[in-house]
Design a protein with these regions (language model features):
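N-terminal targeting signals for export/organelle localization
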Residues: 1-35, 136
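Short active-site neighborhood of thiol/selenol oxidoreductases, capturing the structured segment around
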Residues: 46-58
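Thiol-based oxidoreductase modules, predominantly thioredoxin-like and allied folds used
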Residues: 55, 79-94
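Typically the conserved alpha-helix immediately C-terminal to a functionally engaged Cys/Sec
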Residues: 64-78
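Structural micro-motif
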Residues: 93, 99-108
Length: 136
């Protein structure tokens, strides 16, 4: 009797874990960071999705700090809807210029397709969170 209950409990637990994973995997597997393309920004803006564009350079220590801060903030419930698009400062110069950004480490927040905030070289989690809130 005890063995049957344990097998039954194990089977129920296994099914529950499978269903939990099947439902949550698509949500959890969304990338925090996507490479920037104009088509992707347009699609997100048209859907009303909040967007943060990060102008980033791999050699930039400020950019690396910003990325760590964003990796901590974006999974939080408050910010989960925000999509992060990364512009390569060195490889996408035309995009950098189209945003009017003079420096790497520029963060630009969009809400309903409109720019609502911008910062350059900001590394404070509190201030970056304030910028993210503008896009919500």
């Amino acid at each position: 009797m005890i063995v049957k209950l344990n097998v039954k409990a194990l089977t129920i637990s296994s099914v529950a874990i499978f269903l939990f994973a099947a439902v949550l995997y698509p949500l959890l597997s969304q990338p925090l960071l996507e490479p920037f393309t104009q088509a992707r920004l347009d699609a997100l803006n048209q859907s009303g999705q909040p967007v943060l564009v990060a102008i980033h350079a791999d050699w930039c220590s400020t950019c690396k700090t910003q990325e760590r801060v964003l990796q901590e903030l974006l999974p939080q419930a408050e910010f989960k809807r925000i999509r992060l698009l990364r512009v390569d400062f060195d490889q996408q110069r035309d995009v950098v210029q189209s945003f009017g950004a003079q420096y790497q480490s520029t963060l630009i927040a969009f809400k309903n397709g409109r720019e609502v905030g911008r910062s350059t070289a900001e590394m404070s989690p509190v201030r970056i969170a304030e910028l993210l809130r503008l896009s919500l």
